[in-house]
Amino acid sequence: MDDGTFDVLVVGGGINGAVSALALSSHGLRVALVERHDFASGTSQESSCMVWGGFKYLESRDLKLVAGLCDSRNRLAKAFPTRLAETRFLAAMDHGAPFPPWFASLGAVAYWGLGRLATQPPRHRSRETIERLEPAVDTSLVRGGIEYSDYLLVDNDARFV
């Protein structure tokens, strides 16, 4: 590489560029990565910091995708225990929700199972419990809800890239 010759030029130092550069270089290719601004300064810096298993894909019944995303989430959590924290999420459902709370609770249990029980178990929550847990939430139209776990990065996700 002293001659400045590379096999591959990766343009963009976000998550996709970083992973591509890593994968290519791990296969013996000489890789140059260029970034217009600071490393991971674009979209990779603007995320929610969630490391999730794809809960929303249960609605389309893509169980294979959800299981794969959960496995990836679990591997990251195990590999970087000081950088990821299991976090509880509470979803309150009103009368306009696409599913009744009891059905969403079944989905949360399926999500937990597809995630190989690696997080705290999900919980069905009544309107009264949601009101007690989150007094700032207007529960006048709430029918019930679910509480489940996923992971969050504990610091700047751009640096995690």
Predicted regions and their residues:
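Beta1/beta-strand and adjacent pyrophosphate-binding region of the FAD-binding site
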Residues: D2-N16, A32
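Short alpha-helical patches at coil-to-helix transitions and adjacent helical residues
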Residues: G17, S44-V51, R159
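Glycine-rich FAD pyrophosphate-binding loop
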Residues: S25-E46
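Dinucleotide-binding Rossmann-like beta1-alpha1 core, especially the glycine-rich loop
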Residues: C49-L133
